[in-house]
């Protein structure tokens, strides 16, 4: 159950980061309201706070988080951008998630 909680925390963290970057992107690239910067900043603050909730060392958290970020970003590609990930996207996500699992759940202290 710890693994599921860890993965879900990484996924929520990734959503906060992606939303925090996407909202300024809308303002800069699609001429949307500058008011989008306010929730964008809030999302990035939430992202930073969520990273502190992970119990591992910061560098290990960032490394493992990267794998989940890739998978969540592909979900965003499909849900928000309307582009369905292809088999290569999915293969890449599987590799990064495998790396995340090794980093996050390896038995530390074992030889």
UniProtKB/Swiss-Prot annotation:
Membrane-spanning residues: 7-27, 33-53, 63-83, 90-110
Organism name: Paracidovorax citrulli (strain AAC00-1)
Any one GO cellular component localisation term in the record: plasma membrane
The keyword Transmembrane belongs to this UniProt entry's keyword annotation: yes
Similarity field: Belongs to the UPF0060 family.
Key words, A-Z: Cell inner membrane, Cell membrane, Membrane, Transmembrane, Transmembrane helix
PANTHER family: UPF0060 MEMBRANE PROTEIN YNFA (PTHR36116:SF1)
Protein name, per record: UPF0060 membrane protein Aave_2845
Record Pfam families: UPF0060
Membrane-topology annotation of the record: Multi-pass membrane protein
Compartments reported by the entry: Cell inner membrane
NCBIfam families the record matches: PRK02237.1 (NF002586)
